[in-house]
């Protein structure tokens, strides 16, 4: 049997409080801290910071 992978699916939620989110994955071994990345929010039509949240 193969070992379980280190990548985990995460959700990037907009800090503009629009409810918009992106889904992606990250390697927990290389990046144990929470991810923050600047991406485009189509609701407000601006680039805003997206923060990591758990996928429910």
From Swiss-Prot:
GO terms for biological process, alphabetical: translation
UniProt key word Ribonucleoprotein: yes
Pfam families on file: Ribosomal_L33
PROSITE patterns: RIBOSOMAL_L33
GO molecular function: structural constituent of ribosome
Recorded superkingdom: Bacteria
Keywords linked to the UniProt accession: Ribonucleoprotein, Ribosomal protein
InterPro entries the UniProt entry points to: Ribosomal_bL33 (IPR001705), Ribosomal_bL33_CS (IPR018264), Ribosomal_bL33_sf (IPR038584), Ribosomal_zn-bd (IPR011332)
GO cellular component: cytosolic large ribosomal subunit
HAMAP family tied to this protein: Ribosomal_bL33
Family, similarity comment: Belongs to the bacterial ribosomal protein bL33 family.
Name of the featured protein: Large ribosomal subunit protein bL33
Organism: Haemophilus influenzae (strain ATCC 51907 / DSM 11121 / KW20 / Rd)
């Amino acid at each position: 049997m193969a070992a379980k992978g280190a990548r985990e699916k995460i959700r990037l939620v907009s800090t503009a409080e629009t409810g918009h989110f992106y889904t992606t994955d990250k390697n927990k071994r290389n990046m144990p801290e929470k991810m923050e990345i600047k991406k485009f929010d189509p609701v407000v039509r601006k680039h805003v910071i997206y923060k990591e949240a758990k996928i429910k």
